[in-house]
Amino acid sequence: MKFKNLALLLLITFSTITAYGNNVSTDPINDKNKEKAKETIVGVAASNDNFTTLVAAVKAANLVDVLNGDGPFTVFAPTNDAFGKLPEGTVYSLLKPENKKILTAVLTYHVVAGKFDAKAVVKAIKANNGKFVIKTVQGNSLTAMIKDGNVLLKDTKGNVSKVIMTDVEASNGIIHAIDTVVMPQ
């Protein structure tokens, strides 16, 4: 019995060392993220149940081709819960064809040209005395800051959103999930 346990322990140890030495990932979450990196921002968002409202909005605004483009883009992606915080009827109203221009402005306010992972955002905040002004594709800016260990985004109206998930890789950029929809001026 002792020999069997020792053999099993050696096998597990050897397998772990071999996998580590060959740089093979045994982390299913990490592997899944690497798989998704083959997909564009829209593909990654569409495969995540937390972004169904965002994906519907991107389709309604005819931004799928843009966000499937080469990029790179950084998207501060509002979750379904973030859209749920908006006043009742707001999402329904924004999705109407006659409000496409407004919807496009709101969505592109969440997109930044270039790829900024969480580490780069934090570094920029620290390098700029605690506030990093980010110009969005929409044209207005967001201000990134750190409070209580969380990265926050402040829009031009003074609304604040917290980054709740970072560094979701896509083939043409990166997604950071946020808990509140930010609004342009």
What do the PLM-derived regions correspond to, one by one?
Residues 5-6, 20-185:
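Mature, structured domains of secreted/extracytosolic soluble proteins
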Residues 1-3:
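N-terminal secretory signal peptides that target proteins for export/translocation
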Residues 9-18:
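Bacterial N-terminal signal peptides
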